């Protein structure tokens, strides 16, 4: 992929755009399609969805409406817990591919580890990769012990681990583990998932934002980028989509990076992968 902005190189040498649009909670149809089209018009070349978001069809529609060649847009989607298991995952992939209207998917992830089936699910992802139906495969919400278990039987190690990560929950131990095993990190809810986190009202971020004439959200996105983290802020608002992409004309100083690093509280907002089993514990 020829990136028109920063990319990270995965361990299979595929390049993945470092800033993407997340579409969690976007309504399928016009809302999702418009958000995707606006993002691509603003310069994004990475869209992150999942089957459980129920908006894959809208993502595909937005890509087609943008007029940008398919090969220039990175698309990530995910297999849901109730579809885990070898055969069910293969069927779930084809369903997602059909909904998206795409011949291939750039990155396919296991959405949550669940309890029992992620090893067999991973074997299905390896098959999809070997058949060139996906350009990369990975996981989401996997802790080091989940990855260690997967390493015991996998032929291909995950290229990406998408996890909750923001200034109040910086996942340093997990980031270091993934770095040691050459697994790229993607941050979901990089801005803290709304008002409940209060991240964007933090005075440290506010002061840094003023210095650069940027918003606190832009500062957080820039912090991710300078740490080598792939980041996928979500929005369906055209102005915010454009604002979140406008982060290439400034750079945080070492001191500013350190100040943000010191905000960590190990404050998880979303589910804990060790006791969060959406879609049923049987997964």
Swiss-Prot record:
Single GO molecular function: nucleotide binding
Organism this protein belongs to: Trypanosoma cruzi (strain CL Brener)
Catalytic reaction equation(s): prostaglandin F2alpha + NADP(+) = prostaglandin H2 + NADPH + H(+)
Protein name: 9,11-endoperoxide prostaglandin H2 reductase
Residues that hold substrate according to the record: 111
Taxonomic lineage from the root: Eukaryota, Discoba, Euglenozoa, Kinetoplastea, Metakinetoplastina
Binding site for NADP(+): 23-24, 48, 140-141, 162, 188-193, 234-236, 240-244
Site residues (Lowers pKa of active site Tyr), renumbered to this chain: 78
SUPFAM superfamilies in the cross-refs: NAD(P)-linked oxidoreductase (SSF51430)
């Amino acid at each position: 992929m020829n990136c028109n902005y920063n990319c990270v190189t995965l361990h299979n040498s595929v390049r993945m755009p470092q800033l993407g649009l997340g579409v969690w909670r976007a309504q399928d149809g016009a809302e999702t399609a418009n958000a995707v089209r606006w993002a691509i018009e603003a310069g994004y070349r990475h869209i992150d969805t999942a089957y459980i978001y129920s908006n894959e069809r809208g993502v595909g529609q937005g890509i087609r409406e943008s007029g940008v060649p398919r090969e220039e847009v990175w698309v990530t989607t995910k297999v849901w817990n109730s579809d885990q298991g070898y055969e069910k995952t293969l069927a779930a992939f084809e369903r997602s591919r059909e909904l998206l209207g795409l011949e291939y998917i750039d990155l396919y992830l296991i959405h949550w580890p669940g309890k029992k089936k992620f090893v067999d699910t991973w074997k299905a992802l390896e098959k999809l990769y070997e058949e060139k139906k996906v350009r990369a495969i990975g996981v989401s919400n996997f802790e080091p012990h989940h990855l260690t278990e997967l390493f015991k039987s996998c032929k291909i190690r995950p290229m990406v681990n998408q996890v909750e990560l923001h200034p109040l929950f910086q996942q340093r131990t997990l980031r270091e583990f993934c770095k040691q095993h050459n697994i790229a990190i993607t941050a979901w809810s990089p801005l803290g998932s709304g008002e409940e986190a209060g991240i964007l009202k933090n005075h440290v971020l506010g002061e840094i934002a003023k210095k650069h004439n940027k918003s606190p959200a832009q500062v957080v996105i820039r912090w991710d980028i300078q740490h080598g983290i792939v980041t996928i802020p979500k929005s369906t608002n055209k102005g915010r989509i454009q604002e979140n992409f406008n982060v290439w004309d400034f750079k945080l100083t070492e001191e500013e990076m350190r100040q943000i690093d010191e905000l960590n509280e190990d404050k998880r907002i979303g589910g804990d992968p060790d006791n969060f089993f959406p879609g049923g514990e049987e997964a």
